[in-house]
């Protein structure tokens, strides 16, 4: 089973927990976040992103101990999970993100950033 399969399976579970699909905010954490709306799950994404940064910094300063490595993996898992909730809310799938990563594969990050800058400037000029 691939990592993509695991993400897709988790996305299906999240989709099933949407209040519109019968998810109960009283018994499901995902349903509760979705019921509360974007501010709730976006706040969690911000918190998890910060905790990911802190765990990485701890790993930088504490050395690659198994505990610190596990902490970073756990925080990234939390970040991905809450990001999957956001994707579901906005009608997107993990496959959309994977397709974007594949599209970028082989493209220099510097080139990609420069291209986005030109595209943003062109869009602003058209507005």
UniProtKB/Swiss-Prot annotation:
Entry GO MF terms: ATP binding; phosphoribosyl-ATP diphosphatase activity
Pathway where this protein functions: Amino-acid biosynthesis; L-histidine biosynthesis; L-histidine from 5-phospho-alpha-D-ribose 1-diphosphate: step 2/9
Enzyme superclass (EC): hydrolase
EC number in record: 3.6.1.31
CC per GO annotation: cytoplasm
Keywords assigned: Amino-acid biosynthesis, ATP-binding, Cytoplasm, Histidine biosynthesis, Hydrolase, Nucleotide-binding
Localization terms from the record: Cytoplasm
Keyword Cytoplasm on entry: yes
InterPro entries documented for this protein: HisE (IPR008179), PRib-ATP_PPHydrolase-like (IPR021130)
Catalytic activity, reaction form: 1-(5-phospho-beta-D-ribosyl)-ATP + H2O = 1-(5-phospho-beta-D-ribosyl)-5'-AMP + diphosphate + H(+)
Pfam families noted in UniProt: PRA-PH
NCBIfam families: histidine_hisI, PRK00400.1-3
Family: Belongs to the PRA-PH family.
HAMAP family on file: HisE (MF_01020)
PANTHER family: HISTIDINE BIOSYNTHESIS BIFUNCTIONAL PROTEIN, HISTIDINE BIOSYNTHESIS BIFUNCTIONAL PROTEIN HISIE
Name the record gives this protein: Phosphoribosyl-ATP pyrophosphatase
Designated gene of the protein: hisE
């Amino acid at each position: 089973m691939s990592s993509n399969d695991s993400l897709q399976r988790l996305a299906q579970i999240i989709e099933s927990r949407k209040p519109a699909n019968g998810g109960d905010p009283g018994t499901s954490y995902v349903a509760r976040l979705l019921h509360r709306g974007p501010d709730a799950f976006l706040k969690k994404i911000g918190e998890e992103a910060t905790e990911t940064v802190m765990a990485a910094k701890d790993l930088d300063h504490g050395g690659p101990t198994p505990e610190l490595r596990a902490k970073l993996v756990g925080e990234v898992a939390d970040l991905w999970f809450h990001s999957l909730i956001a994707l579901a809310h906005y009608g997107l799938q993990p496959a959309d993100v994977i397709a974007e990563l594949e599209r970028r594969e082989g493209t220099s990050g510097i080139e990609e950033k420069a291209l986005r800058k030109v595209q943003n400037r062109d869009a602003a000029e058209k507005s």
